């Protein structure tokens, strides 16, 4: 890092501080101000926040690493702007008119208090033990590699970077609430995009262009069926990404994440009205088309450079692991460290900071909101709005502490836990997705049906995760049908079958129990909206919204056709 890099980082920090100070000075009189930014966010802030919140360590390390190790396969999860459009066009009207703060609260409106509690517990545990922990852990690794510092003042630089990232982000999240998340995203998103674009351009320049990347990666097979790194659709016998499983599994996980998860939907709930919320999702969908090119393809570039350097008799581009293989997870930080000139490296570091801080801030705020609204306020409904804000700030502090305490565990088993993260999402998503999908699309879905769908998903998911831990450490143990279903079955196929099972549970239990009253589900399910509510929704979009939606869908289709 040169002096010019530090100057660029300093300017970024000053701009960030300026925004945070302005946000903190704004009055936050009630919980809606603190957790939802006063429900007056515009489409630019919503779309930028959706994108910036989504881009975290799983992209800077995981997605680029996936590009370097397996090529295009993970693009199924990243070319999902179409799923954000479903959030905007299908779910925004129901979420907006319900005036809820959280997704568990919406399930209580649609089903019962037990459903709210189940989803709140699942969400809080998964946020603290997976999303917060992995973002912090990976953030420390990224900065250790980018700065090239092993120790500082006798302390492992990993700890300085990880703890510093958490504390700085926590400070502005605690005092600024949702507004700090939204408005810092407006600054952070363009910096992240610009920094990543520079890496893409310089990477292609060093390698020799797109054709050279496709030539090198297209010559590398990734399975016994002969599929190469450049192929998105792979044999159904592929052990990791069978094409049918990838299409079904990525859709289920994407639906859960983009349309029902508090972490994302909270940005839409902060919208001024349906129009701003929907346009925010359209803007976010445009931005979501970019990660494949900004993170996954740079990972493929890093792999191609590694192969090219080795072919020329050099030592390779990527650092090597102890087992003699290239460290794919180091792809993105290695590109930053080796290719970028002074000043530009500082800008890209700002982009990395922006991604990690925005993602962490969103996690802190969403977790605090879940605790405050779904637990504290439920048991103390007469709590004043100002006290709820204080409780939210205190909850954020607790979540920060839990995240910090989890870092040593993450570091000791980081590689193993990171490998299981996709497995965690694949078993977390089906039950929740089934409860929301049928709850909004089918009037006959009963409170007991939705609740038992959630319970079935939770029990099956925990069984799968427990089996993964047991059998992976037990050696070659015979397990019969149980072992095949809960350990050996491809995680994407398991996700699909689990979703189908949860759908069946919801339907069967609903038909066996009392149907919900019209008053209970009015405005929350298709076919129950009043003429006034339908007119409000119709007035919230025009032909330009449709045109942009069609453009996004067209780009998505073209991508699949090109990499088929």
Features from the language model and the residues they span:
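Membrane-embedded helix-loop-helix hairpins and adjacent transmembrane boundary segments
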Residues: 1-564
């Amino acid at each position: 890092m040169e002096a010019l890099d530090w100057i660029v980082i300093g300017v970024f920090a000053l701009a960030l501080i300026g925004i945070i100070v302005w946000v903190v000075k704004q009055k936050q009189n009630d919980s809606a101000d603190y957790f939802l930014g006063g429900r007056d966010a515009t489409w630019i802030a919503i779309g930028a926040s959706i994108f910036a919140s989504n881009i975290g360590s799983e992209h800077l390390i995981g997605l680029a690493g996936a590009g370097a190790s397996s090529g295009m396969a993970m693009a199924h999860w990243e070319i999902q702007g179409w799923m954000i459009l479903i959030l905007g066009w299908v779910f925004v009207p129901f979420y907006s008119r319900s005036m809820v703060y959280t997704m568990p609260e919406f399930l209580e409106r649609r089903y019962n208090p037990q459903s709210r509690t189940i989803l709140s517990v699942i969400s809080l545990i998964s946020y603290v033990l997976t999303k917060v922990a992995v973002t912090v852990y990976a953030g420390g690794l990224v900065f250790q590699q980018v700065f090239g510092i092993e120790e500082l003042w006798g302390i492992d630089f990993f700890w300085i970077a990880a703890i510093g990232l958490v504390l700085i982000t926590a400070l502005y999240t605690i005092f600024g609430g949702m507004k700090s998340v939204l408005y810092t995203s407006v600054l952070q998103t363009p910096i992240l995009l610009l920094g990543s674009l520079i890496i893409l351009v310089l990477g292609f320049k060093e390698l020799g262009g797109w054709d050279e990347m496709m030539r090198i990666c297209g010559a590398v097979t990734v399975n016994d069926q002969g599929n190469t790194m450049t192929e998105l659709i792979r044999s159904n016998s592929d052990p990791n990404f069978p094409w049918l499983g990838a299409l079904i599994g990525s859709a289920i996980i994407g639906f859960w994440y983009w349309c029902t998860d508090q972490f994302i939907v909270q940005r839409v709930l902060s919208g001024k009205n349906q129009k701003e919320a929907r346009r925010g999702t359209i803007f976010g969908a445009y931005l979501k088309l970019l990660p494949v090119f900004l993170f996954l393809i740079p990972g493929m570039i890093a792999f191609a450079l590694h192969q090219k350097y080795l072919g020329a008799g050099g030592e390779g581009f990527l650092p090597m692991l102890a087992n003699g293989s290239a460290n794919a997870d180091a792809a993105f930080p290695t590109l930053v460290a080796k290719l970028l000139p002074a000043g530009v490296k500082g800008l890209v570091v700002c982009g990395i900071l922006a991604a990690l801080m925005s993602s962490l801030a969103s996690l802190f705020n969403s977790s605090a909101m879940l605790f405050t609204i779904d637990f504290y306020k439920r048991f103390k409904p007469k709590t004043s709005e100002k006290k709820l804000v204080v409780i939210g700030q205190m909850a954020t502090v607790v979540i920060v502490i839990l995240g910090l305490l989890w870092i040593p565990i993450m570091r000791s088993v980081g590689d193993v836990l990171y490998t299981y993260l996709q497995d965690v999402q694949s078993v977390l998503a089906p039950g929740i997705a089934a409860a929301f999908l049928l709850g909004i699309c089918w009037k006959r879905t009963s409170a007991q049906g939705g609740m038992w769908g959630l319970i079935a998903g939770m029990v099956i998911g925990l069984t799968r995760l427990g089996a993964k831990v047991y059998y992976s450490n037990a050696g070659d143990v015979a397990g019969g049908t149980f072992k095949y279903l809960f350990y050996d079955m491809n995680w994407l196929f398991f996700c699909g079958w689990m979703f189908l099972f949860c759908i069946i549970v919801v339907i069967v239990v609903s038909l066996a129990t009392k149907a919900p009253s019209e008053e209970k589900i009015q405005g929350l399910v298709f076919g129950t909206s009043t003429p006034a509510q339908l007119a409000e929704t119709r007035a919230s979009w025009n032909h330009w919204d449709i045109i942009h939606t069609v453009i996004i869908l067209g780009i998505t289709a073209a991508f699949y056709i090109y990499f088929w």
